[in-house]
């Protein structure tokens, strides 16, 4: 059953998922690197203003998870670099109601996702060489130019399978939490890929670069396309985001 867990409830999602409750899952509860909240879904909706996208600078979700643990951090969702019928695997390490330690001053404003790939082609264009792809069991990534924090970078983009899962996740979270599927835009209508003067004032989707001037994630994504696709999915939504079941909060860890 493909689902994510929000306030103890299973919400259906159209991509392969592994939660901390499942065999092979990654359980951030055991490390206590987060703040726990006992919230109902309605209370969580009231307290949520954003959903934040990150890139991991790791080849796989497992490595990303290990790095977060070693650094005393956490992230609610991780997207692996695999392909299962056109979608990358989504890992959930905590209930969405918890405050993961992943985006500083906005940790309590919303959950986030680490898209697991190595973007830094500006440093090394051989990160996804044939040898490295074989070593880490990951697919090929294309190089694109992206302007982040007013600097144009040569970056490895995430795969289409990862993007497909990103869109599914955003759709499900926005539907469940009544969150606008919209990135911040300037007066000309362009998505802002730099720090915002007041990130907490934007209700909707954010990149880590909107929160911290030292961050350039998520780099290499076509955010206009992602936003448009998610809005189309939401307009035609039939099953994704549906509440499947409810658990007592005592089973969240």
Task: Locate each region found by the language model.
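Hydrophobic faces of well-ordered beta-strands that scaffold small-molecule active sites
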Residues: 53, 111-113, 205-207
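Basic/polar, cationic surfaces and motifs that engage anionic cell-wall
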Residues: 1-24, 44, 119-253
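Peptidoglycan-targeting cell-wall enzymes and recognition modules
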Residues: 63-162
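N-terminal catalytic cores of peptidoglycan-degrading enzymes
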Residues: 1-109
